[in-house]
Amino acid sequence: MTKVKICGLSTQEAVTAAVSSGADYIGFVFAKSKRQVSLEQAQKLAKMIPEKVKKVGVFVSPTLEELKIAIKTVPLDLVQVHGDYDEDLQTDFSVPLIRAVQIKKGKENLTSKADYLLFDAPIAGSGETFDWQQLETEQLQKPFFIAGGLTSDNVKECIEHFAPYAVDVSSGVETNGRKDIEKIKRFIESVKK
C-alpha cells in the first residue's frame, strides 16, 4: 500500500491528527518558509510521534553540519533535501536521504545516490501539480515519493498513474495557510481506503 507523508507540520493538533489518521511520515520544514519550524519546536513535536511513524527533516541546500545537528537534536529518521547538495556527503550521516527533484519541462536527471527520490512541482509547497506526463518512472530502481498539488480529490489518480512508494502533501491539507485537521484525515483516508 502507498505510504503517506504529511509535510509542514508545526502544531500539536496537526501532528496528532496525522498520526491518529495513519500517516507514515511526518515532515518538519527547516528551510526558510511559512511552514518553517525551529529545532526546538520539532524536538517537542517529535516526542508525540510513535516510533513507527518516521520523522523527516526538510532542507534546502543544507550544510552537512546543519543536517547532523538536526538528525541528532530532533531526532530525525530521514532527511529530505531540495536545492544544491553533494550527495557524496550522505555517507557522513546515519539516516536515509530523500532527494527532491523539481519536475519542469523536459527530461530531468533522475540519477541519484539518495535512498529515495521525491518528485515535486517546480515551486515546492505552492499547491501546484506538475505535468505528470513529463515524468517517466517505469525504469526507476529506487522507491519514490510524488508531491506537488496533491489533495484528497486527486491523490487516487496520482497513485494509479505512478504507483509510487509514497505520496507527500502540504498545502493540499491546508485552509487559509494553516493545517486543516479534517483535510489531513480525508487525504490519508483517500490513500489508504
Swiss-Prot record:
Family annotation (InterPro entries): Aldolase_TIM, PRAI_dom, RibuloseP-bd_barrel, TrpF_fam
EC number annotated for this UniProt entry: 5.3.1.24
Alphabetic keyword roster: Amino-acid biosynthesis, Aromatic amino acid biosynthesis, Isomerase, Tryptophan biosynthesis
Protein name: N-(5'-phosphoribosyl)anthranilate isomerase
Gene3D superfamilies: Aldolase class I
Biological process terms in GO annotation: L-tryptophan biosynthetic process
One Pfam family from the record: PRAI
Pathway: Amino-acid biosynthesis; L-tryptophan biosynthesis; L-tryptophan from chorismate: step 3/5
Organism: Streptococcus mutans serotype c (strain ATCC 700610 / UA159)
